[in-house]
UniProtKB/Swiss-Prot annotation:
It catalyses: L-glutamyl-tRNA(Gln) + L-glutamine + ATP + H2O = L-glutaminyl-tRNA(Gln) + L-glutamate + ADP + phosphate + H(+); L-aspartyl-tRNA(Asn) + L-glutamine + ATP + H2O = L-asparaginyl-tRNA(Asn) + L-glutamate + ADP + phosphate + 2 H(+). Allows the formation of correctly charged Asn-tRNA(Asn) or Gln-tRNA(Gln) through the transamidation of misacylated Asp-tRNA(Asn) or Glu-tRNA(Gln) in organisms which lack either or both of asparaginyl-tRNA or glutaminyl-tRNA synthetases. The reaction takes place in the presence of glutamine and ATP through an activated phospho-Asp-tRNA(Asn) or phospho-Glu-tRNA(Gln). It comes from the Bacteria. One of its GO terms (biological process) is glutaminyl-tRNAGln biosynthesis via transamidation. NCBIfam families: gatC. Keywords: ATP-binding, Ligase, Nucleotide-binding, Protein biosynthesis. PANTHER family: GLUTAMYL-TRNA(GLN) AMIDOTRANSFERASE SUBUNIT C, MITOCHONDRIAL. The gene is gatC. This is Aspartyl/glutamyl-tRNA(Asn/Gln) amidotransferase subunit C.
């Protein structure tokens, strides 16, 4: 895949980046080089290789997910918190719809 000046201009417009005509000309070979490198990565044979999610092993030490019954520091305070809400709905905070 290769890009031309019109494609770079469209990408810049979609990304809301102001690019001059001189910069457009310089970006075309750079983007083509990046895309060629990505295509080259796609040609590597990775059959039998397990995907790596991290360079070093990550072990998360998780605590049990339990509700603390202490009224000052714990959970089980939903009713007390929702008592201050202007429009609670079904046990949750009611908010106005902002997306149609």
């Amino acid at each position: 895949m290769s890009v031309d000046t019109a494609t770079v201009a469209k990408i810049a417009s979609l990304a809301r980046i102001k690019v001059s005509e001189a910069e457009l000309g310089a970006m075309v070979p750079e983007l083509n080089g990046i895309l060629a490198w990505v295509e080259q990565l796609g040609e590597v044979d990775v059959t039998g290789i397990e995907p790596m999610t991290a360079v070093i092993p990550n072990k998360q030490r998780l605590r049990d997910d339990v509700v603390n019954a202490d009224p000052l520091t714990g959970g089980d305070m939903r009713d007390a918190v929702l008592a201050n809400a202007p429009a609670p709905e079904h046990g949750f905070f009611g908010v106005p719809k902002v997306i149609e």
